[in-house]
Design a protein with these regions (language model features):
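S-adenosylmethionine-dependent methyltransferases
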Residues: 1-231
């Protein structure tokens, strides 16, 4: 569980709720029956209870692009959402957000509970258009396409790259954009940013670019990748 303080820069409403999100997650992680020190159980649990640092990178990066943008009624998808912090950012921008996670229990006990508490505490009655989808990415289905797709710390398994590509290919609007926040390497798991970039480029459908790098000289280098359809 990350102890990092969440900072939604340039959005006053988001600054009000950041501590609530952290405090709630700290309580919840103690109450749910997940083995200690377990990040992943392949095919059963994909880390949705933990707040991953790449999700924190996303929610500090997104306001730099969208703080002054009108995103009302934009369709946004967060893949592998867990706590859903990037998706919540877009909810507060009045977008229609679909939260996707492998585990239904994560969506019910964590993501949806956040949204309910935020709506009640801050009278955010405008938050209405929320969808939840659980399950493996190979079974992902939606009745809409998305203007924006975001995902944090989901590129750790090379076996998932084809599934991710298929979602982008089938559900990203032609003028849409996807942001994947990722570690440069996932030690002991197999995935890496370079492997994913090579995979996406090999499909010859999308442009993929590194648009942000976090390198503190101590921890794993982290990147934000931007994906758009080729012109």
């Amino acid at each position: 569980m990350s102890s990092n303080k969440i900072i939604f820069k340039n959005d006053e409403n988001l600054n009000k709720i950041e501590l609530d999100i952290i405090n709630y997650s700290n309580k919840l992680i103690k109450s749910l029956n997940v083995p200690e020190n377990t990040d992943l159980i392949s095919g059963k649990y994909e880390g949705g209870i933990k707040i991953w640092e790449c999700a924190l990178d996303l929610i500090q990066f997104l306001p730099k692009i969208y703080s002054k943008s009108n995103l009302t009624n934009f369709n946004v998808l967060e893949l592998g959402c867990g706590h859903g912090l990037p998706g919540i950012y877009f909810l507060l921008k009045k977008s229609n957000v679909t939260f996707q996670d492998f585990n239904k229990e994560v969506l019910e006990n964590i993501t949806n509970n956040y949204i309910i508490q935020l709506k009640d505490k801050y009278n955010l009655d405008y938050i209405k258009n929320v969808d939840f989808i659980s399950g493996d990415w190979k079974e992902f289905k939606s009745n809409k396409k998305f203007n924006i797709i975001v995902s944090g710390d989901t590129l750790y398994n090379i076996d998932n790259y084809e599934k991710i590509f298929n979602i982008l290919y089938n559900y990203l609007e032609k003028n849409g954009v996807a942001y994947f926040s990722t570690k440069k390497f996932y030690y002991g798991v197999g995935g890496s940013s370079s492997e994913f970039i090579y995979f996406i480029e090999s499909k010859n459908c999308f442009e993929i670019n590194k648009i942000n790098e976090i390198n503190d000289g101590i921890s794993n280098i982290r990147l934000i990748l931007e994906i758009k359809w080729k012109k």
